């Protein structure tokens, strides 16, 4: 049953310094680029900006999927790929003095390479302008093989560019994949993480789950075991918060104590880096391996 009560106290958090948030917002407008921090209204964005970390959203603000939890635009034709986007993002990284950057993207099932090439081009542009900046990738699943490149080929392009970490979020337990992740599958996401390890075992892999959609503790633990079976190194666990009334409702607010328990279970299962808490998101404290 969905919850309609007010947010628990542990989910209320100040946004951080207004000056840091406004600086990033101004640069985003200036360069015509996008961040998932702003598009997804992340509660941690002020904290991350203060730590010189940001997550850039590649390939425009419109997704070809329609996941029921996500704030990102969907439902109409995506924009043409901006060939200047890598250069613009690199300029923003340099201006902000970012030490750690996460690159993610909307799903672009309409493109022959599903957007993999834009990840590679953006990594190259950032490294040219800011050679000391580390780059983490948070990719879609590249499972729509209608184009010229298979899922494995798309992933291989990015792995060859040697990101500091390769992140792909499983998002929820097996039973809830259909209603939560329209267009994605549990097996396809596990295959992304397995493929990265097959191509380069030295690149750390990472995944994340949203809790509060109706999953049980037993289902969460089974999902963590599945992630470890494909060699996933790092994990984030956070509370699902619907961006609007038209998104999937919350079924349960997991307490900080429950998150701590799950985090300890994850460490016992062998994850090297674990961030588990109500306001944790997939890029939260990413520079620390979280």
From Swiss-Prot:
Q: Which residues form the signal peptide?
A: none
**Which of this chain's residues are annotated to bind [4Fe-4S] cluster 1?**
37, 42, 48, 283
Span of domain Radical SAM core: 49-272
Which UniProt keywords are listed? 4Fe-4S, Cytoplasm, Iron, Iron-sulfur, Metal-binding, S-adenosyl-L-methionine, Transferase
Fetch the Gene3D superfamilies from UniProt. Answer: Aldolase class I
What is this enzyme's class at the first EC digit?
Answer: transferase
Annotated [4Fe-4S] cluster 2 binding lies at 63, 67, 70
Q: Which cofactor does it need?
A: [4Fe-4S] cluster
Could you tell me the superkingdom of the organism this chain comes from?
A: Bacteria
Q: Which Pfam families match?
A: Radical_SAM (PF04055)
Has keyword Transferase?
yes
Where does it live in the cell?
Cytoplasm
EC number(s) reported in the record: 2.8.1.8
Q: In which pathway does it act?
A: Protein modification; protein lipoylation via endogenous pathway; protein N(6)-(lipoyl)lysine from octanoyl-[acyl-carrier-protein]: step 2/2
* Keyword rRNA processing tagged: no
An example Gene Ontology CC term for this record: cytoplasm
The reaction(s) catalysed by this protein are: [[Fe-S] cluster scaffold protein carrying a second [4Fe-4S](2+) cluster] + N(6)-octanoyl-L-lysyl-[protein] + 2 oxidized [2Fe-2S]-[ferredoxin] + 2 S-adenosyl-L-methionine + 4 H(+) = [[Fe-S] cluster scaffold protein] + N(6)-[(R)-dihydrolipoyl]-L-lysyl-[protein] + 4 Fe(3+) + 2 hydrogen sulfide + 2 5'-deoxyadenosine + 2 L-methionine + 2 reduced [2Fe-2S]-[ferredoxin]
Q: Known InterPro entries for this protein?
A: Aldolase_TIM (IPR013785), Elp3/MiaA/NifB-like_rSAM (IPR006638), Lipoyl_synth (IPR003698), rSAM (IPR007197)
Please give the NCBIfam families that the UniProt record associates with this protein.
lipA (TIGR00510), PRK05481.1 (NF004019), PRK12928.1 (NF009544)
Report the protein name in the record: Lipoyl synthase 2
Species whose genome carries this gene = Thermosynechococcus vestitus (strain NIES-2133 / IAM M-273 / BP-1)
Phylogenetic classification of the source organism:
Bacteria, Bacillati, Cyanobacteriota, Cyanophyceae, Acaryochloridales
